[in-house]
Amino acid sequence: MKLFSFEKSVGGVVFRKQGSELFFLLLQYRSYQWDFPKGHIEQGENEEQALRREIWEETKIKDIEVYPVFRSIVRYFYAAKKNEKAERIREGRGIYIFKKVAYYLVLTSQSKVELDFENKDYLWLNFEEAMKKLGNDDSRGVLKAAKNFIGS
């Protein structure tokens, strides 16, 4: 059994403008945690291709503009539990995961979201509300950096 895995993912700080206000998209995952759209980079994809695919799969938002000059990296480690652990063992993947997520800033004009099976809910929130709702400090740091970038 393989114990360790190193995995790369990509995520999007998806935002839209409404007048002079900015609204950021957060998804509620099955774990009940609120976060940005994100997912694995599949074989043969570059980061932008994976980002576009993940945003489409999770939200059905297709009209996006990716800002490649904004790239924020988050690294973390976790141990798979319960169903994920069993699935990883079956697939021969490590149960201790070193994860690297590259986040990009993504502008859209779409406000309608159609959720996939991975997500329970979504919200478009202003910066202050999004900072309160996000489920972890890493994501709050990414949002703060994105807001600073937009403001510059």
Regions found by a protein language model. Give the residues of each.
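Conserved N-terminal beta-strand and adjoining loop/helix that marks the start
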Residues: 1-24
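Short secondary-structure boundary/capping segments
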Residues: 2, 26, 95-96, 113-115
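Short connector loops at helix/strand junctions that flank enzyme active sites
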Residues: 7-9, 31, 96-101
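Residue-level signal for short segments within beta-strands and strand-turn junctions
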Residues: 14-16, 28-29, 107-108
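Conserved Nudix-box catalytic region and its N-terminal flanking loop in Nudix hydrolases
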Residues: 21-64
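Short aromatic/basic micro-patch
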Residues: 35, 98, 124
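Active-site segment of metal-dependent pyrophosphate-handling enzymes
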Residues: 60-111
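NUDIX/MutT-family hydrolases
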Residues: 102-107, 112-145
